[in-house]
């Protein structure tokens, strides 16, 4: 420790002080999981010193192997470490709560005024930007995950399976996990994770939860606590599901949304982009809660709001409730809002369960190849699945009338420019979407003047 680094830990943090920090974070957590984790690292490790870098990375590596939004889980994990279950619930909920209300408002504007020429023009430019963002996501995941020919082969097989044969996403995840498990036993060097997020390399001074701080009693694994959390978690899930079933029946959209997004929450290995193909298969093709175009627009809204990207499910729920007119044509906003709340509840409940129930168990298997090699296989498959999602988006953006219709040259140019900005010039996602939306609006305004 250098002379510029504090030798004493900061004073204990009250639950109220922590509450206001998590509340503020929920409004500024832009930039996807990478940006959100960077914000928390700067605030909690470097500035406030609530937790040491080593303990921060230790928690992050746990969250990375769980299904669900890792930044949300990291917030819940740190909140739980500091202030027990109450702290975890507060931290995790406030991380996505602002974006929930923002997306409900934006979804209402979209459904009520989406056909207004100015709004349609902005969306015309945003759609190819979203396609470029998904392609870039596949590139980023692939560059990190595909370290050898075996993993490249898994990614290619996953792409062919979903693109050519329309294999459901859960089967692809299951097959990739089995291949990863067997591969870890046969060729462990091909399925090693490479150390997750690495070891701590810097010391910012003594922290409240420091490297040598003992694990607090509430974070230690006991079978009694495990059983209590498990029973309560099942009750929270089954209680709401039973209420929906008793009130509306199994075939009602709200009940189906609860069941579908529970399954989706358990399949989000690799982040939100990984689960989007599954959500597309269910939301667009199977249940027809929204159209392909609406899903692209929803992803754009999700990219431009704070909170985890998986909050796009809130938009899907709102649009599904609105279009199905669940409570009649006079209550479209109410129907959309209730559906959005149902979807969000069932999407995020498993994340809290994994933290409160699974963190002590995951700690015992952290770094064990038998545990991590299936995740390596799944991550490789995710690359192929996300690339298929990009192809799906590109088809609907560039050939809106199908291959028999005209090719849209302007969206192609906008999409290429957006990808170049992301890849070559490291431009942020929000500026890219804003610029592409402005280009689409400008085109819409000048098109009538040009007589096109």
Give the predicted meaning of each segment.
Residues 1-66, 77-305, 309-452:
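Multi-pass membrane proteins that catalyze or facilitate reactions on polyprenyl-/lipid-phosphate substrates
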